[in-house]
């Protein structure tokens, strides 16, 4: 399997604040040979990066010059047996190395946000459970973070996958 290049999720589906997080569940055991997800520690507290190239095309990953400025050697790679969970904030820089094994590395991803985090754009990953409140009540007020967020392309006209975007297959 291909690598998943360094990226931040919030650029794919920006919200009024940065509460969204993703919980990943490894379906199979995932060791270094499978290319587990890697996270850059504390990057959720840093800047948001432009995930468009110089031609203003969405690439779904950090630009080479931004990646060069990040200490990717500090990444924590999250290995674990089947059923292990990964958890990351929408601003966290993360990705994975190529899968060098004959074993797949399926990772079930579920995204959650506080009820007062409203999406700015169409979500490309539609689900019958979208906007389901799993705890608490619907918000009466939106919480707006003062830090800006670059908007993605108009996903309502179609979306393939992060893999296709990053491999320039979109």
Regions inferred by a protein language model and the residue ranges of each:
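Double-stranded beta-helix
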Residues: 30-97
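Short connector loops at helix/strand junctions that flank enzyme active sites
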Residues: 1-3, 18-20, 105
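Short beta-strand-initiation
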Residues: 8, 73-75, 105
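Non-heme Fe(II)/2-oxoglutarate
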Residues: 85, 91-170
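Short, conserved beta-strand element in jelly-roll/cupin
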Residues: 7, 14-32, 79-82, 87, ...
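Active-site-proximal flexible loops/turns
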Residues: 14-16, 48, 96, 121
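Short acidic (Asp/Glu) patches
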Residues: 1-11
């Amino acid at each position: 399997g291909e690598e998943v290049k360094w990226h931040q999720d919030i650029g794919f589906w920006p919200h009024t604040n940065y509460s969204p997080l993703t919980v990943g569940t490894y379906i199979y055991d995932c060791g270094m040979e499978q290319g587990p997800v890697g996270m850059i520690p504390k990057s959720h507290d840093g800047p948001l990066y432009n995930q468009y190239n110089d031609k203003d095309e969405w690439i779904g990953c950090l630009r080479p010059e931004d990646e060069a400025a990040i200490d990717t050697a500090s990444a924590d790679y999250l290995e674990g047996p089947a059923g292990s969970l990964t958890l990351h904030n929408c601003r966290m820089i993360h990705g994975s190395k190529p899968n060098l094994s004959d074993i797949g590395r399926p990772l079930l991803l579920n995204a959650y946000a506080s009820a007062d985090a409203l999406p700015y754009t169409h979500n490309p990953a539609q689900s019958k459970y979208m906007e389901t409140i799993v705890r608490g009540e619907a918000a009466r007020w939106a919480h707006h973070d003062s830090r800006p967020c670059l908007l993605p392309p108009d996903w309502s006209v179609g979306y393939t996958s992060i893999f296709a975007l990053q491999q320039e297959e979109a």
